Amino acid sequence: MPRREIPFVPDQYYHFYNRGNNRQVVFMERENYVYFLKGIKRYLRGRVEVIAYCLMPTHYHLLVKVVAKHQTSEVANQTSEVLRQDASKQVSLAMQKFLISYTKAINKRFERTGALFQGQFQAKPVTTYKYLLTLCAYIHAKYRRYTPSLRAR
């Protein structure tokens, strides 16, 4: 995967999202949604705080805040730049492992092969308070708009 141009900075907000490869469905049944949410908890706990999320049949949106590492004696002497780089790598690696894990589970469950998502997950920094509020409202509005179709699954 190509290197991410924008690093993840502790205490900053980001919009993570991706969609199915060729816009295919990535959540085929209710259990897939549950498995995805459990994966977020398993892989991203301690690295990001999920502020809002929306899982749709063909894609997902996550509004997250990168968690600042607690200062310990081991890392106290490191510069803030080193800590930023470490947080950025940890978040990227955790998301990568999480999405690979989810893809493998779906491929096994539905006897399929290949990529499930359209490339690397997208991550946009949330640079203003206004954008944070707008994004949060957008994510929740998308969920309400698609809730009837999710209940049918």
Residue ranges and their predicted role:
Residues 1-153:
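Short catalytic/metal-binding and nucleic-acid-binding patches
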